From Swiss-Prot:
InterPro entries on file: Enolase, Enolase-like_C_sf, Enolase-like_N, Enolase_C, Enolase_CS, Enolase_N
Gene that this sequence comes from: eno
Keyword Acetylation among record annotations: no
Stated family: Belongs to the enolase family.
Listed name of the protein: Enolase
NCBIfam families linked to this entry: eno
Keywords: Cytoplasm, Glycolysis, Lyase, Magnesium, Metal-binding, Secreted
Lineage per the UniProt record: Bacteria, Bacillati, Bacillota, Clostridia, Eubacteriales
Species of provenance: Clostridium botulinum (strain Eklund 17B / Type B)
Length: 431
């Protein structure tokens, strides 16, 4: 096997994401004619500690959301540095990209520029070897298909409705394969649509393909999902569990949690009580961002109260950053990390965060963003690292479905080697 292959060109362009905003797409060209391509996602609710997504700010073009500066940074500064590099030396290339930027948050060149290059390099290397990306990144032991954390009711900043919490999801832990898991979720999704219609609710979709009805309360979202699970022929708490992304930083104001649509203002302790009541009442297996990104004491209390029986996922809390994750591990905040490639900006840093989480006994959930493209890198990544869980929206809208379809292909390719762990993917809780 050739272990040296030069990069001969790097080309970026501005494309559109699923929310009709510009994003960066990068192609890396190799001396043997191989091409690797990657497109960068973008978030709606973003943590304050995320790596910087560079936007042009020109109000006359795409309402200031253009990314031509990031594109130019790739085509000029980054391309000049990468041409002649060995495509198989991913850690070196990622280190060089970080040093080329020179800032703590990738604010000079833009995390959207840097990530596009980092992922395109990995795709080019895999293509040159004739390997699937998951095999190139994960090696011979990459075999675990993920339990989907499927968003079927959207609220918060992902929808224009009366629901405070951002995402209500289903997790088909009772399935025996990813193929079966996807079918189960699709059946519940269609059943939920009919259930909402029967109740007189609208069935318009949010950013991630979930329904966005104006429900009477946050709890009604769970009630109607459980009803749909039952009508679809499954048992909530056995075949399917509920997962929530509270996105609490979005309604954390002056040290309090303001649930405007319910007319409640809660302290950190009261917010923990709120979730504990729900966990005791409903078959909830995972809560993401239950507390705000700066409420470390609240996170610690939440973990003390619920961390043995519910997965507590830090998204805005950790932003795929090893420094923040290390602090969380030290003080006992959360027991899981959400992994978003564009929060940190390179493949190598992402893999480092997953490794740190695993060493600490934390689960890792590989995630999309609300602004997505047809790029399926995260589908390969979740199998490469055997994470066992993926969060990539509803089984609707092609930018979400593309990820699920890629996982179907991977499961087919792995054949009998493929593992679907179901409830065992939650290895650090008792449920």
């Amino acid at each position: 096997m050739n272990d040296y292959l030069e990069i001969i060109d790097v080309v970026a362009r501005q494309i559109l994401d699923s929310r009709c905003f510009p994003t960066v797409e990068v192609e890396v060209y190799l001396e043997d004619g191989t091409i690797g391509r990657a497109a960068v996602p973008s978030g709606a609710s973003t943590g304050m500690y995320e790596a910087v997504e560079l936007r042009d700010g020109d109000k006359d073009k795409y309402l200031g959301k253009g990314v031509l500066t990031a594109v130019q940074n790739v085509n000029d500064t980054i391309a000049e540095a990468l041409i002649g590099c060995n495509v198989f030396d991913q850690p070196y290339i990622d280190k060089m990209l970080i040093e080329l930027d020179g800032t703590d948050n990738k604010g000079k060149l833009g995390a959207n520029a840097i990530l596009g290059v980092s992922l395109a390099v990995a795709n080019a290397a895999a293509n040159a070897l004739g390997l699937s990306l998951y095999k190139y990144v994960g090696g011979v032991n990459a075999k675990v298909l993920p339990v989907p954390m499927m968003n079927i009711i959207n609220g918060g900043s992902h929808a224009d409705n009366s629901v405070d919490l951002q995402e209500f999801m289903i997790m088909p832990v009772g399935a025996t394969s990813f193929t079966e898991a996807l079918r189960m979720c699709a059946e519940v999704y269609h059943t939920l649509k009919n259930t909402l219609k029967d109740k007189g609710y609208a069935t318009g979709l949010g950013d991630e393909g979930g329904f966005a009805p104006n429900l009477k309360s946050n709890a009604e979202a769970i009630d109607v999902i459980i009803e749909a699970i039952t009508k679809a022929g499954y048992k909530a708490g056995e075949d399917m569990f509920i997962a929530i992304d509270a996105a609490s930083s979005e309604y954390y104001k002056d040290g309090k949690y303001v649930l405007e649509n319910e007319g409640k203002t809660l302290t950190s302790a009261e917010m923990v009580d709120f979730f504990e009541d729900w966990v005791n009442k409903y078959p909830i297996i995972s809560i993401e961002d239950g507390m705000a990104e700066e409420d470390w004491d609240g996170w610690k209390l939440l973990n003390e109260r619920l961390g043995k029986k519910v997965q507590l996922v830090g998204d805005d809390l950790f932003v795929t950053n090893t420094e923040r994750l290390e602090k969380g591990i030290e003080i006992g905040a959360a027991n899981s990390i959400l992994i978003k490639l564009n929060q940190i900006g390179t493949l190598t840093e992402t893999l480092n965060a997953i490794e740190m989480a695993n060493r600490a006994g934390y689960t890792a959930v590989i995630s999309h963003r609300s602004g997505e493209t047809e790029d399926t890198t995260i589908s390969d990544l979740v199998v490469a690292v055997n994470a066992g869980q993926i969060k990539t929206g509803a089984p609707a809208r092609s930018e979400r479905v593309a990820k699920y379809n890629q996982l179907l292909r991977i499961e087919e390719e792995l054949e009998d080697v493929a593992e679907y762990r179901g409830k065992k993917a939650f290895f650090n809780i008792k449920k």
